[in-house]
A protein has these predicted regions:
Chain B
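Active-site-flanking beta-strand signature of metal-NTP-handling nucleotidyl enzymes
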Residues: 29-33, 242-245, 402-403
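M16/MPP (pitrilysin/insulinase) zinc-metallopeptidase core fold and M16-derived inactive scaffolds
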Residues: 24, 29-93, 265-283, 296
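A conserved active-site cap/scaffold subdomain adjacent to cofactor or substrate pockets
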Residues: 251-268
Length: 403, 411
């Protein structure tokens, strides 16, 4: 990792065998830094940025990226906005110059503002047609008392009240090199990457506001009444944060719970009882805090039973896991690491997130060594000493699940 | 770039075995590509292909359902299966040291026990899966448009079947379907990544020795699209969803490269013509086009999702763009951009063994030939505007079906 004078952090992981290259630019602009009266600002800004930058209008800008063969993805999330690109190495400098225009010299034109707003409103409305996502957005909102619960999509009122001036103000206040990250992976030379990053992004100024501290509500239940076929069930548990001594133990515990198809949740909820098509638990984290969410979708008459089995299985972790379960969890994590190491896009994304969350980038070898280092005794001591219990519980559908 | 070798063999029982070998790859991917899907189902069998795909993981003579799940996880395998109208695919990726064990497991699974108790449990899972998709309007739209476009053609059948067909399905029906379709001469075993060809081929031969050949016929009735506009209110939709389905080109047709690039020019999600006419001005949230290839025919699909208030305006603009494309064709610059983007995508499709396996297995299942990603790239890079013009001469979009799924209060 290298930090430019303006505070931009750069990480490079060469993949000498790879004929391609991917990069991710992470800017700490997300729902957590949206002011309460401007929820959805980070998301709208990301769309607006693409409406022209530097010497080019929106169309010429898209054409210029296409002319380099750039495959791209971008979007705002809870804590940050990412801009990812995959292309051939010879186009890297020209592509980064275009992204520098986007970040440092966007036009943010008045005449595109209404269409940006219309898109944001449609994105928000589309959430109604995605019951699992709608429930998980609300679950986060119920669990966090701090801005980490704020909806990325914003709210109807805040989107309708947004003005071009206010949104430009958000751009000036929150987009900057300080706190941002550039991560590159693929067939590249690290020195060359640094030289190119310095050339195009070295003059980027500004600092991002520092992330807010995490605060939680008191665990509770909630229900969203909606006419759906399946009832959606979501659980939220506190977990250890990234960087914590027990972090890798917690990751292995989640793998035992929901890693492969021999994992506990899949076996007990789906394979033995046929209660669901989808059931899963996944680890989540924001800077300085870790959590575990579990999800299932099932028909109303089976919702209560599904919730009970899920809660029971998650609490039962406190009694420990077997050696066979730990072995399977470890080999699964190891395979995931090797397979993700084949993809430049996956690596660039992971490096960028590491720099944001941990302030340093972990190599695949380091993660593997840490995972392999967790013994059965250590994992079971962790589970006994810090049991997963007392979750926030939410449901969405035609029946409410309860105690 | 790493050196790739292609190998192929046909076993005495008719099973085709193919491999794209890269001795420097860090993983090995392998899979069975069975030429069977919803289009091969007889009356009363609707959904059996997909239900059987689930049952394949529920145990064999040698293994219980638990054994199967446990063994995959002991290898740390990244694995799954999918079913569509024409293919059922079982695949996995592992570290190279586990490849023989994964082959043993997947091969054994191709001869499932179909135990009665597992059948009943899994029936419930399938019914949940059908319920899950009813909560997703874009999927409902796709299924209904497919049915409307294909009419009496077997490609009209829903892959998941229906609640009724799944509730009525018997184990005997599934066993009969399996015996008819999972015959070795109707299957391809494909490998990609780091592997020892001789070892794998010998193991495959040993594992599949008892499999016997069968006919596995497939109907290819004639088909003529019937252009029209349909519209259905759906009580679980709050946004409007639409597709335009137009005649395209088959999976083995030479025109497929030009057809894919033509779809990109029209509906690339970042910079296609529809993006600038519809998404940029904020009329819809999503506008995309792609080319979908089947065995004897193909379709162009335009997909739209957005505010129901704009339905008429959106419909008119899409039809205008389709007409303009048919009348004036594509410009050289936009073709160059679309070609370059496709070429880059192919480089990234080659990064992982699993992604290579899909290209290899799907391509071979349809064409019976190996097509390296680099060969595809060459075909694409040599396209000229007249290649796309030739496809447009048949005026495919004038024969499009337009299907809207709208919120109930817009019905």
């Amino acid at each position: 990792m290298h930090t430019l004078d303006n505070g931009l952090r750069v990480a490079v992981e060469p993949q000498p065998w790879n004929p391609g290259l991917s990069f991710t630019i992470l800017v700490p602009v997300g729902a957590t830094s949206d002011p309460e009266e401007r929820l959805g600002a980070a998301s709208m800004l990301e769309t607006w940025l693409w409406k022209g930058a530097g010497p080019r209008g929106a169309r010429a800008f898209a054409d210029a990226l296409d002319a380099l063969g750039v495959r791209r993805q971008s979007g705002a999330g809870v804590e940050y906005t990412t801009f990812s690109a995959s292309l051939l190495p010879e186009g890297f400098s020209a592509a980064l110059e275009l992204y520098a225009d986007l970040l440092m010299r966007p036009h943010l034109p008045d005449d595109a503002f209404e269409s940006v707003r219309a898109l944001a409103l449609q994105e928000l409305a589309a959430l109604e047609d995605q019951p699992p996502r709608k429930l998980l957005v609300r679950l986060r909102r119920e669990a966090f008392a701090s801005p980490h619960g704020q909806p990325v999509e914003g709210e109807r009122e805040t989107l309708e009240r947004m003005t071009p001036e206010a949104l430009r103000g958000e751009y000036r206040r929150r987009y900057g090199a300080g706190g941002s990250v550039l991560a590159v992976s693929g067939g590249v030379d690290p020195d060359e990457v640094l030289r190119i990053a310095e050339k195009h992004l070295g003059a980027w100024s500004g600092d991002a506001p520092s992330p807010p501290a995490v605060r939680l509500t008191v665990p509770h239940r909630f229900h969203i009444e909606q006419e759906t076929e399946q009832v959606q069930i979501g659980l939220f548990y506190k977990d250890v944060p990234p960087g914590h001594y027990d972090f890798y133990a917690s990751r292995l515990a989640v793998a035992v719970l929901s890693g492969g198809m021999s994992s506990r949740l899949f076996t007990e909820v789906r394979e033995k009882r046929g209660l669901v098509y989808a059931v899963s638990a996944s680890p989540g984290s924001v800077k300085g805090f870790g959590y575990l969410t579990a999800y299932a979708g099932t028909m109303p008459e089976r919702a209560q039973a599904t919730l009970e089995v899920m809660e029971e299985e998650i609490e039962r972790l406190a009694q420990g896991v077997t050696r066979e379960e730990l072995d399977r969890a470890k080999v699964g994590v190891r395979a995931d690491l090797v397979l993700s190491g084949e993809s430049s896009r996956a690596r660039a994304g992971a490096l960028a997130r590491d720099l944001f969350i941990l302030d340093r980038a972990r190599s695949l070898e380091e993660v593997e060594a840490e995972v392999m280092d967790v013994t059965l005794e250590r994992l079971n001591a962790f589970l006994a000493g810090r049991p997963y219990r007392d979750p926030w519980i939410g449901s969405l559908g035609t029946v409410e699940v309860g105690p | 770039m790493s050196v790739l070798t292609f190998r192929e063999a046909t076993l005495p029982n008719g099973l085709r075995v193919i491999a794209e070998i890269n001795r420097e790859a860090k993983s090995t991917a392998l899979g069975y590509f069975v030429r069977t899907g919803s289009r091969d189902e007889l009356a009363g069998e609707e959904g059996v292909s997909h239900f059987l795909e689930h049952m394949v993981f529920k145990g064999t003579e040698r293994r219980s359902a638990w054994d199967v799940n446990r063994e995959f996880d002991e290898m740390g395998a990244k694995y799954n299966a999918f079913t569509n109208e024409e293919l059922t695919v079982f695949y996995g990726a592992v570290l190279p040291e586990f490849a023989p064990r994964l082959l043993d497991l997947l091969s054994d699974l191709m001869r499932p026990a179909l135990r009665e108790d597992e059948f009943e449990t899994e029936r419930k899972v399938i019914l949940e899966e059908i319920a899950l998709y009813r909560d997703r309007p874009h999927f409902v739209l796709y299924e209904r448009a497919q049915e409307a476009y294909f009419g009496r053609h077997p490609l009209a059948k829903p892959v998941l079947g229906t609640t009724e067909s799944i509730e009525a399905m018997t184990r005997a029906q599934m066993a009969a379907y399996h015996a008819r379709r999972y015959v070795p001469n109707n299957m391809t075993l494909a490998f990609a990544g780091n592997l020892d060809w001789d070892e794998m081929l010998a193991l495959a031969e040993r594992m599949t020795r008892g499999w016997t050949r069968g006919a596995a016929p497939r109907n290819h009735p004639g088909f003529t699209p019937e252009p029209r506009r349909l519209r259905t209110p759906y009580d679980k939709a709050s946004q409007a969803y639409a597709v335009f389905v137009a005649p395209g080109h088959a999976a083995a047709a030479e025109e497929r490269y030009a057809a894919r690039v033509l779809a990109d020019v029209l509906g690339d999600p970042d910079n296609g013509r529809l993006f600038w006419r519809l998404v940029d001005p904020g009329l819809v949230e999503t506008a995309m086009a792609y080319h979908h290839e089947y065995e004897e025919l193909g379709t162009f699909l335009v997909y739209l999702q957005g505010d129901p208030a704009h339905e008429e305006e959106v419909s008119a603009r899409v039809r205008e763009e389709l007409q303009r494309l048919e009348k004036r064709g594509v410009e050289a610059e936009e073709l160059e951009r679309a070609k370059l983007k496709t070429a880059t995508s192919l480089v990234f499709a080659g990064e992982t063994s699993l992604s290579r396996l899909f290209y290899l297995g799907m391509g071979y299942s349809y064409t019976g030939r190996y097509e390296a990603l680099d060969t595809v790239r060459r075909w694409v890079m040599h396209l000229e505007p007249y290649h796309l013009g030739e496809l447009l001469e048949a005026r495919p979009f004038s024969r499009a079906l337009e299907y809207w799924l709208v919120p109930a209060d817009h019905g």
